[in-house]
Amino acid sequence: MLLSRAISVVALLACICCGVHTQDSKADLGTLRTTDSAIITSQRRLRTSVDLVDNEERFRWPFQQFFKDRWHRKQIKTYFRDQKDNVSEGLVEQLIARHGLKNVEKVLSEVKFPLAVQISIRKILVNYKGKQAFTRPHLTPADTL
């Protein structure tokens, strides 16, 4: 947006220097300046008027979620390495609840399992996703079909 404003200001300045539309261009240039400054001040007000208690996410570092997800995946990998042949449905659901479905699916795509265990884990994930869809208040079983 600022780039388009800058281009239009440069175009107006070129027109003023050449003598084309001098009266109208000066008025447009003044309007552009006031509009830009109004936009910038409103953005500054929004940034400075944030309530610190309600908006904690503003102070999160961009890489914080990356390291958190990485830690969760490491925990899941250690569990799956220890229980490679003997994976139960309840424990997989606990892992999903504790570490998130996205992290469990990511680890499952990286870790190699025997085929029977892999099929049972996929069934658990499908059942878990189905339970999630039915427990959402705005969805009915007819909506998910």
From Swiss-Prot:
It comes from the Eukaryota. Residues 1-22 form the signal peptide. The keyword Cell membrane does not apply. Its main location: secreted. GO terms for cellular component: extracellular region; host cell plasma membrane; membrane. Transmembrane segments: none annotated. It is found in: Secreted; Host cell membrane. Keywords: Host cell membrane, Host membrane, Membrane, Secreted, Signal. The keyword Secreted applies. A motif (RxLR-dEER) lies at residues 44-58. Belongs to the RxLR effector family. The RxLR-dEER motif acts to carry the protein into the host cell cytoplasm through binding to cell surface phosphatidylinositol-3-phosphate. Secreted effector that triggers a robust hypersensitive response (HR) in Lactuca sativa cv. Design that is resistant to multiple B.lactucae races, including Bl:24. This is RxLR effector protein BLR40. It comes from Bremia lactucae (Lettuce downy mildew).
